[in-house]
Amino acid sequence: MSNNALIPQSKLPNLGTTIFTQMSALAQQHNAINLSQGFPDFDGPTYLQERLAYHVAQGANQYAPMTGVQALREAIADKTAELYGHKPDANSEITVTAGATEALYAAITALVRAGDEVICFDPSYDSYAPAVELSGGVVKRVALQPPHFRPDWQAFAALLSDKTRLVILNTPHNPSATVWQKADFAALWQAIAEREIYVLSDEVYEHICFAEEGHASVLAHPLLRERAIAVSSFGKTYHMTGWKVGYCVAPAAISAELRKVHQYLTFAVNTPAQLALADMLRAEPEHYRELPDFYRKRRDLFVNALSKSRLEILPCEGTYFLLADYSAISDLDDVSFCQWLTKEVGVAAIPLSVFCADPFPHRLIRLCFAKQESTLLAAAERLNTL
């Protein structure tokens, strides 16, 4: 390196390569079954692929509108009305983004100012905190305790201050596989009603909810939705994570600020994919309606196949992840255990501690069951040797 080379001072000095990238690379190196990263090993709907090819062939290959293709925004509005009893305005309240992660980043950047405090529920998805920190915000954390990972509303209330700007929630919850209930949203509203606090609701697994009462969305709460951004993901719903198309729903005033950020992050999202997704929403709504049963069968197959293992499987109410307690098997910390599991047993998992800022004393790993049945059975066969 030249003496004239400049080394930038990192804005995120405590971050390196994500654990998901590390574990997937380790799985490939050791020919392990990869249940670490959250993506399917099967393809999405044939009709969706055909519509993508159609729109490419028809020449829909230039920039889409910054806010998203009109047909897709209108289809999202109709779906939202069907599911949650609230129809957002397709022109002013729905924004299509380059995956849910961009929506989350744009929302946080639009709302959080230097010195603002943002409350997260830990364990939490790893993209929240860096986005807050890059905006000069400070993350405050409410710990969710296993095995049920329910919000502690007294602990939440204790964190509220005049500096609190935003609350980030996630339901169905990654990584715990728990879901919020209507009572949780009522408790949240009661806590913040008299304060100027926004809500960012990460609902990318909205269609993978096994709770009897179904998915509870912030959009179904008439008061909270007036100050909330709800984020969703077509990649999760249609098994097409590589397409990176998501969207967010928010009141017009909030959407206007979010769009200011979005236009300078990506400006627009893949045009033919948006058109294909609009067609899919209209032509085959049964896909998202039947998705809970589709994944419930995989969950139950995997749990039953693991019945002979010494892993203790925690309740799974939503998402395509299972948590497993390995306390009966090893005293290793969860990162070391996942490395050992990948190298010696041939199954890759994610340690739960990476989703937490504070030390995590529990021996829990996350396993993804968005896989073919043969993949799940092969993984269970290896895990049953533990």
Task: Annotate each language-model stretch with its function.
Residues N3, H221, R225-R296, D300, ...:
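Conserved core segment of the aminotransferase class I/II
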Residues N3-G99, A106, M280-A283:
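N-terminal small-domain helix-loop-helix segment of the aminotransferase-like
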Residues D78, A157-A158, W340-A349, F355-L386:
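PLP-dependent enzyme catalytic core of the Aspartate aminotransferase-like
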Residues A110-V132:
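Conserved PLP-anchoring active-site segment centered on the Schiff-base-forming lysine
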Residues L134-K140:
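A short helix-loop-beta submotif of the ANL/AMP-binding
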Residues G137, E194-I197, R225-E226:
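A short helix->loop->beta-strand "cap" motif at the edges of active sites that frequently abuts
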Residues L144-E212:
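Active-site phosphate-binding strand-loop segment of PLP-dependent enzymes
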Residues A278, F294-V303, I313-Y326, F360:
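Conserved glycine-rich beta-strand-loop-beta hairpin in the small C-terminal domain of fold type I
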